[in-house]
Amino acid sequence: EPGGSPDPLYHKRNGEIEMGKTYIFGHKNPDTDTITSSLVMANFERKMGNSEAVACRLGNINKETEYVLNYLGIEAPELIEKVEDGANVILVDHNSPSESVENLENANILKVVDHHKIALNTSYPLFYRAEPVGCTETVMYKLYKENGIEIDEKIAGLMLSAIISDTLLLKSPTTTDEDRKAVEELAKISGLDPEVYGLDMLKAGTDLSSFTIDEIL
């Protein structure tokens, strides 16, 4: 049950409960999907009973993401550069060690939620969810729905922003019906107009403020 007993994935490999924080982060040179996914996944983990989940980032926030966080009134994730040996981590929006945190090879990877090709090898089993969709947040949207976890207005805004960013307002060739369905639902929950808000967001990340949406896309 959401909010009930901790997820069994929080057992260490030797069967003992691992105390301490769970660090959740996306790739280096973070984009909007990476930053929002860490925040959305941390919220998901807390709702699932992991009170130690912490959203992190591996680099500076770009202008587009800054616009999103300011618009929604949400603080940026904590900046980290490396993790200690044995630290519990969850990877979002990436799985390749070369794009990840320093010392990942000595961390305890609990979960991966992603939409990229698989480049990760571990010597132990873990929860791995990757789908061929346009954005990690589309996968996160499905995880919330499957687990009966409420998507509130701000979480919906984060998810929506990332899908708009990664799929360029659903116009990128990587866009799938899953992404379109998520955007439709998340627009209702967040109260944001994907076209109007999305264009403002994309403009904020560029110096294309004088161009129309058709010229940009």
For each feature predicted by the language model, list its residue ranges.
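Short, positively charged low-complexity motifs
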Residues: 1-7
